[in-house]
Amino acid sequence: MLGLGTITKKVFGTPNDRKVKSVRPLVAKINALEPEFQALDDAGLIAKTEEFKQRIAAGESLDDLLPEAFANAREGARRALGLRAFDTQLMGGIFLHQGNISEMKTGEGKTLVATLPAYLNALTGKGVHIVTVNDYLARRDAEWMGKVYAQLGMTCGVVVPFQQEDEKHAAYAADITYATNNELGFDYLRDNMKSELSQMSQRGHHYAIVDEVDSILIDEARTPLIISGPSQDKSDLYVTIDKVIPELVEEHYTIDEKTRGVSFTDEGNEFLEDRLHALGILPEEQSLYDPESTTIVHHINQGLRAHKLFNKDQQYIVRNGEVVLIDEFTGRMTPGRRLSEGLHQALEAKEGVEIKPENVTLASVTFQNYFRLYDKLGGMTGTAATEAEEFAEIYGLGVVEVPTNRPIQREDEHDQIYRTVQEKFDAIVKTIKEAHAKGQPILVGTTSIEKSEYLSQLLKKEDVPHNVLNARQHEQEAQIVADAGKLGAVTIATNMAGRGTDIQLGGNVEMRVLQALAETPEANPDEIRTRIEAEVAENKRKVLEAGGLFVLATERHESRRIDNQLRGRSGRQGDPGRSAFFLSLEDDLMRIFGSERLDKVLSSLGMKEGEAIVHPWVNKSLEKAQAKVEGRNFDIRKQLLKFDDVMNDQRKTIFSQRMEIMETDDVAEITRDMRHQVINDLVDEFIPPKSYADQWNVEGLYAAILEKVGADTDVIKWAEEEGVDDEIIRERLEKASDEFMAAKAAQFGVENMRRIEKQLLLQTIDQKWREHLLTLEHLRSVVGFRGYAQRDPLNEYKTEGFQLFESMLDSLRVDVTDKLGKIRPLTEEEQQAMMRQIAAQQAAAQAANEAARQPQPAMAGAGAEAEEGTPAEGFVESDPTTWGNPGRNDRCPCGSGKKFKHCHGRYT
């Protein structure tokens, strides 16, 4: 019997159906234009691009231009790649242009879809960013789709880590730029730490298309991008505390797996106090409850979390003596990403590797706030519908499910639930053997490296050939995925989200052709391609007969979306396929979210060992549990965003102020206003408003002006004059300070003084912002306790955060005024002394290098030393103008072999 909702949808259609229907006339227009654009020669396509640009400049809207631009882009792709966009791909492109998320199933050609709205929006000349989840995909898509843009007379660039600055500038200057979400965010932060406009890479945030948008804007939403610098080394403390943690017993602590939190019981606190007193970490008279113990308690908590909540080969792996985190959503290693607040150091102590110092935040931004900078945003994914509410509420993005080009023929089976993990794995191995025997390729999804390797051992015992794809094998990722659709292939993989390479039934022709040419370079490429295409076609026929790709998941993820992504690997482009989930009551999701009740029910049903329960009701109850988790995670992200918005508003204010300063050649007016404000504050402090002259502290005002402004004034004499009030003194002090700074500018030269003011202003802003970020972090960590006093932590954070921001601006004015008042040109003697110091240090460095070149016994793990060379042509040590303009990380022109920043760069 159909429910009322189902009947209503059948009669009136769903909102999604209506959206799809609304763009069909546009698709018809594009199709009608196809013959006209096919008739153009290659130069004609480029001429159309120029024509479109002129029409936009004349005021025509992108929406009006869409049918022609899409028709031109479709024809460009057909000629460049031999790929013609289907009607469903045109729909996906239209929804992206309108600022929606296009939900398109695996194999529907999302990479090609992005070229359509990217081309249209790039016609404005403002640049378009296409965002991918990893560097491999950014490079691949830029190279592949770059041919389409070139066919249309557009430029395409790619941004990757460790790129030369000139390459990065060129990539961002291109019409369409491919980049990862991480690199875009970090470049935004780096740009806002630069001191010259010409050094900045990004040229604004006009339009972005985010591939795997759910992964980036939902899964990664809480991940802050942080540029940091080293702080005080506390490695001994981490090591000592790490030795104490294994001594704890279960009665000493509690763990909440749902919130991933830990806390100590009273027994645990007593035990720790005794141990820490004995180790000398906690002074005898000091308790763990004392305010002075906050840091130690924090370290102990992080040590416990490292041991009890973070498992090796699940949340992280140890590689080359480093703890490398694993992305729980994609199964990839994330080198360079570190846990904050000492947790990463606690993991390093646990694993006995080198403990790197904690870092101080220099600049940070979350993906939520970075991507909200764009004027327009679009996204693509195979699975977004389950998170539609979050996309709409946080980012203002609608989700549209785009119909597949061909109907999906995949058979999604009901979950099979076993009582124990061992029973589940026995059933999985049996199912894999059956599928392998009939030649059906099978993709087995696991949630951790540990489980993927355990299953691999079971299959080895049964002599089943297979491949394993997890964070350890990420270098062979493309090859393993390309082989996963071969006849009888068995592939065990951790999460497949964002893998980027489609699993093609029968094998991947392009990958096999490349392999064959690498093995026999002298062979005829055309003959090899013809032979391989025939072999793959025959294999595909056999695979289809065997039932297509079988996706077998060994566990449910917290998010339905991740499960759907794994399922979506099968049944691409109308191919047959099959998917099934094998679960046990001991799985994390089942255990944490109430498997005890289900276990009792199954026991009462008389379930025998090795038997599975399969029923749609079980599926529904599991999906409800997942929906609860998703809802809770959404609430957490929403609350965190409210807190982050406080910092984000301040960040935007500071960054826009920096930009204004960089765009201004002469900042004298800004520094003068700061100086006058400092003087006003000092006058108010020492000559209170509406006070009598005998209440004035004129001597204090004189000393404060001399110290903080640098000007030696006659304020004591002025105060003795008849009829003088605080306003007259204020005006005279401002005038005296202006004359003082004008005389200083004459000493330096006006141009030099302007440059000094600008650099000093930017440096001080950066320093104050860093200090402010640290203060906000501390406030954020304690403000939650205000809830116990019936005060709203968010409102408290907003109020105090604003007060701290105002205080930072006051401090900024005082510091800039103070520094400008104290600077002076070096005397000739001081310049000579500085040059002598440089020469002495240079001689010492050269002597050290000479000693280093003598034969030395080999040392295990010794790093490569810097290469020494001869000084650059024209280099004169005492004349910095002959040093050229090396970058901070370039070799020093003196020939020492050191980086410039560690050599002569220290004196510039």
Curated annotation (Swiss-Prot):
It holds the Pfam family SecA_SW. It is an enzyme of class 7 (translocase). This is Protein translocase subunit SecA. Residues 848-864 have a biased composition (Low complexity). GO terms for biological process: intracellular protein transmembrane transport; protein import; protein targeting; protein transport by the Sec complex. GO terms for cellular component: cell envelope Sec protein transport complex; cytosol; plasma membrane. Belongs to the SecA family. Keywords: ATP-binding, Cell inner membrane, Cell membrane, Cytoplasm, Membrane, Metal-binding, Nucleotide-binding, Protein transport, Translocase, Translocation, Transport, Zinc. SMART domains: SecA_DEAD, SecA_PP_bind. InterPro entries: Helicase_ATP-bd, Helicase_C-like, P-loop_NTPase, SEC_C_motif, SecA, SecA_CS, SecA_DEAD, SecA_motor_DEAD. Part of the Sec protein translocase complex. Interacts with the SecYEG preprotein conducting channel. Has a central role in coupling the hydrolysis of ATP to the transfer of proteins into and across the cell membrane, serving both as a receptor for the preprotein-SecB complex and as an ATP-driven molecular motor driving the stepwise translocation of polypeptide chains across the membrane. Zn(2+) binds at residues 892, 894, 903-904. Its EC number is 7.4.2.8. The keyword Membrane applies. It comes from Dinoroseobacter shibae (strain DSM 16493 / NCIMB 14021 / DFL 12).
